[in-house]
């Protein structure tokens, strides 16, 4: 094998399979070639390899991209396989591509490039998911629904208010990913094994060619730390927890017991034995994939725990967790966006349900405090006694409850039947809650406008990140072409 050289003897197939990362390395194969190209251009620029050798190696790498990675032979990992491919076509001069470089800084750089690409895609999909929630909220500003605590009817609210709560949680997820991206998009290349190199390299040149925004400066930290990956997996786990809450509500609300929504056929399945069934399978799988993401985080944390400086092969086992976790999140975002966008709401049932369970009790207590001046706790106890009665309470019921609790007649303290009627009306309840963040129509409209502006800004920031990376890679490939054609 190429990297065992004359130091080590042969290795058994079983051991090779055990230590190999080839299958997982396909995630970083294209990134590996980009790293090779940037490193070669830097080596040539610094006078560390001849132009002819640089051009021949770059040509071989371009051919590999055109042919696809299926042409690579066996090897311990993708890095060895690519180098072997180049040497087979270029001869011993192909070995110059590894000058002033270790697999340690190489793989760390490749992971960051591939992860950066995944994060850009995920953030785009997350923006689309938030946009879907905001659009539905915009269309349902005054649709009344029951609000819940402990999964029991609590207070009336609007569907828009409810959906914006989910949107705001996802906005925080987006902000976490944006922040983490800045720490992911740093270059470890040039750190070599861990102690840098005696060759006169230019780390800033490769950093710029690969679209990084800066260096992971300390060479030991650059190759041995994977906290950036842990941070991504943490962000991913929180995102998946938030998505699982939406999924759980879709599952519950689509049951015959709730009957609030119907899942589109595209996102449902039926039973193999019960022909009447329409199961919300996609939502159930999103709920399950939140466990996959959390498991990836826990696995990654466990691998990184107590590793001595600097690089350890344990980190090879971390990489599958990265791709598994972020893959679960991206697929869940795409499916959940489609599922949510095509839900059919039963607005009549939602509004009818909004008054069940005495959901206007809080406003009744508040109204008693405002009109009569009694302490809130007294009002709370009076309304609590009313809640025992069946049906809609009358002013006489209210007076009787007040007499039992506080020896008061609220009707003699200015509280009228009209006040009672207003307090029990769900629309009045909602309209009175106009403070920042409340469900009143004017406040929901303000929040919707703010979220739309936020999404425009977020899309612009993401486009700028994407443009910087794409421009850098384009300049890299232009540099490759110039070097190849100049010979």
From Swiss-Prot:
The reaction(s) this protein catalyses: 2-(N(omega)-L-arginino)succinate = fumarate + L-arginine
Subcellular location: Cytoplasm
CDD domains: Argininosuccinate_lyase
Keyword Lyase assigned: yes
Pathway(s) this gene product operates in, as recorded in its UniProt entry: Amino-acid biosynthesis; L-arginine biosynthesis; L-arginine from L-ornithine and carbamoyl phosphate: step 3/3
InterPro entries documented for this protein: Arg_succ_lyase_C, Argininosuccinate_lyase, Fumarase/histidase_N, Fumarate_lyase_fam, Fumarate_lyase_N, L-Aspartase-like
Enzyme class: lyase
Annotated Gene Ontology cellular component terms: cytosol
Cited Gene3D superfamilies: Fumarase/aspartase (C-terminal domain), Fumarase/aspartase (Central domain), Fumarase/aspartase (N-terminal domain)
A Gene Ontology biological process term: L-arginine biosynthetic process
PANTHER family: ARGININOSUCCINATE LYASE
Similarity comment text for this entry: Belongs to the lyase 1 family. Argininosuccinate lyase subfamily.
Protein name: Argininosuccinate lyase
